[in-house]
């Protein structure tokens, strides 16, 4: 009987280990800042939608291994919070995590750096210290290559409008998320959250703009440490949990993490291309993902020419260079 019980316990343990998914298990929160896609696409928004219905759509888009969905976080401060069905281990000398974006390189160079579609998002990670399965424990920022120039304890207030969305930060600077002819929804403001104002707090990265002139602005990717910053198939897109820091920017050691929050890290107006906004296509535990041969990683964004026009392909979906679905 004892032998039979041991066999059953071993079998159950094996099934439990096999059941672990390398990909996002659940999306817990979605709080986008204003932006040109907000209230229109990524996720799609319909009349009568509520925070709960939109959160469910984001969860459906990002959870699992489909690899063809994308969400936008809007301008600086917008965020999404998700978790895995297991603890992502911090293995010494290895990259542990990847958050998938839709970055591509244009083939141009600026000051020795490759020009790209980088829209960097800051990655925050958290343990499940209290064991309740919720992202309510302390967060730690992943300090990427621009961390030394970043501004912590930054805050922006956005004000509802059906025109340009005005904002003011805690330093007294002002600006706006400008409407453009490409996106004609009633408002660029996430109205299901508020019809008045929204306040976002976090870390502000230095601008990574490259001005081509004639109103066309591109970005230069940071070296490492951010979401939607380097192509998905690049080592520079992968994250080492040893890069985690506390609120004062001091390194912390985490044995493992369960939850991830990604937040648009820059406040940049791309001219005719609209605001810079982090886009997310999923995430994976690299220690599990690299051991699975029957489940491919999320596809990278690829440049292609169709009918003489540059387009961006992510999986089975195609977008123009301004992010409009074709």
Residue ranges: model-predicted function:
Residues 126-132:
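Short loop/turn segments immediately following beta-strands, especially the blade-tip
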Residues 129, 306, 321:
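Short, ordered coil/turn segments that flank beta-strands lining enzyme active or ligand-binding pockets
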